[in-house]
Amino acid sequence: MVIGVTGKIGTGKSTVCEILKNKYGAHVVNVDRIGHEVLEEVKEKLVELFGGSVLEDGKVNRKKLAGIVFESRENLKKLELLVHPLMKKRVQEIINKTSGLIVIEAALLKRMGLDQLCDHVITVVASRETILKRNREADRRLKFQEDIVPQGIVVANNSTLEDLEKKVEEVMKLVWEKRE
């Protein structure tokens, strides 16, 4: 079974994935980490698109790249057109060779088409205030995540870790019931 976990920056996607890993033995596929690997593989193309300043000591400086791509939708689109197909292919390869419960953690699950690989999708949501408390840099990125709309099962994460664990437990009961 493949479950996608999505939501905006700072909502608690990683925490939900950690709960699924620890309580249910899920294999978590962190799409951000895959993205970091893919960036290194396409660094020459990144220099072509965004200039040499995106490299530092021969490696992609993700902070500089983020500064460039999050200043315009056009730059973000260029980056996504380059890396998303490669990332999706890598996720599909992992799913093909992994058994048991697989969890895909991705803010841009739908935009990347990864939701099509999932049996279920959990969207983690939190208030803007909660998000900004958790992550000071979130404000800049939130405007580029406006298209992340809740899909599948929605889990609100504005409270405690214990509360979130209970909600994830309830979700998993539903998911297992639907499976039978």
From Swiss-Prot:
GO molecular function per UniProt: ATP binding; dephospho-CoA kinase activity
Superkingdom, natural source: Bacteria
SUPFAM superfamilies hit by this protein: P-loop containing nucleoside triphosphate hydrolases
Domain DPCK: 2-180
Catalytic activity: 3'-dephospho-CoA + ATP = ADP + CoA + H(+)
Annotated Gene Ontology cellular component terms: cytoplasm
Keywords, ordered alphabetically: ATP-binding, Coenzyme A biosynthesis, Cytoplasm, Kinase, Nucleotide-binding, Transferase
Pfam families linked: CoaE (PF01121)
Family the entry assigns: Belongs to the CoaE family.
Protein known as: Dephospho-CoA kinase
